[in-house]
Each structure stands twice: as structure tokens, then as C-alpha cells.
């Protein structure tokens, strides 16, 4: 571990810090850092520095609305209703996500708590042993599947989990869970925004 030389602290202190961040070891922490840097490098830019802020906002809004309309016209709304039905009937709802879409888990958890639905957000690397019971469901959110590229162990653990599973993703080539909702995209650049909007629709359906 070369990091202790650069940071001028002991190997034991580095390991302790890493464990406090919920990582099992340095290798896992390093892979997470590589993944994060990769996500940053792929981050989309929407604002044109040569245009005014007002023009940028208008262009973004116009394109965003077009992408929303495309998604609504092509998504399987019955699948969303089925997932909502499963959520309402679930004993516990487990949520797992990586990257930007992980923040959505907290929105879902907050909304489900309103309906007294127990919700657990799984750790970022799916390391903990979750004791899934009958009527529990696991919802996996992945905008484009890039996160899974770095961690095959997570894929293996999810597939081996004995629990009813749902995957919500914009990438139709991922076959991870028994049940899937594919979020159609007009422009891949808007994937993070469109998948979050789709979750908002799902949460609206919970009110029925």
C-alpha cells in the first residue's frame, strides 16, 4: 500500500480510515476511487460557455422536455404499476444503487416511510449480509451500468440473493434481475435526469 507514504500516516491508520468509510480493504477503496474518477471524466456538460445563461437554460429545458416525452411514449407503464404493487405488498424494500442515482434511494426511502413501508438502503458495495425474507424485494438502480463494469462481485452477489428483484436502468443490454424496467432514452446525455424523472412518476403512482 503506497498511500501511507504519500499521506505520511501508518498503514494501520489508513486501513482504519478505509473501514470507517465502509470499505472492507484498500483494494476495494482503490476500485471505488477509480470508478468515481471515471464517472467524473464521463460527466456530461450541458452549458455552452459561448452562450448566455438564459439561452443555455432554454436549450436545456427544451431538450429535457423532448426527452421526457420520448420516455413517456416508449416506457412500459404497466411495469411501473407492477413494481408499485410489489412495493406496497412488500415486507421490506431494499434499495441498491451506485453513482449519481444513489441519491435517488434516499428520496424513495423518504417517500416509502410516509406509507410505513420499511426501506433499507444497501451499502455501496453490497458487502453486508442481508437476511432477505419472503415478501421482501430488492430494487437495483443503475443509470447505464458503468458501475457494474468495475465490480463483477456485486453482480454475482445480487444474482445469488434469494429475493424478488427489480432493476431500473436506461441500458437495455443489462440482464441482472428477474424483473426489469428499461427507461428509454432519446439522448443518452440526459440519462441521469430521465431516470430520476421516472422515479418521480413511480412515487406518484404510490399515492393511488
Task: Show the residue positions of the predicted features.
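Hydrophobic packing residues in well-ordered alpha-helices of helical domains and bundles
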Residues: 61, 80-83, 105, 195
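Glycine-rich phosphate/diphosphate-binding loops that line cofactor/substrate pockets in enzymes
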Residues: 78-91
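HTH-adjacent hinge/linker in prokaryotic transcriptional regulators
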Residues: 1, 5-79
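Glycine-rich phosphate-binding loops that contact phosphosugars or nucleotide phosphates
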Residues: 88-207
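Short secondary-structure transition/capping segments
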Residues: 27, 40-45, 74-77, 126, ...
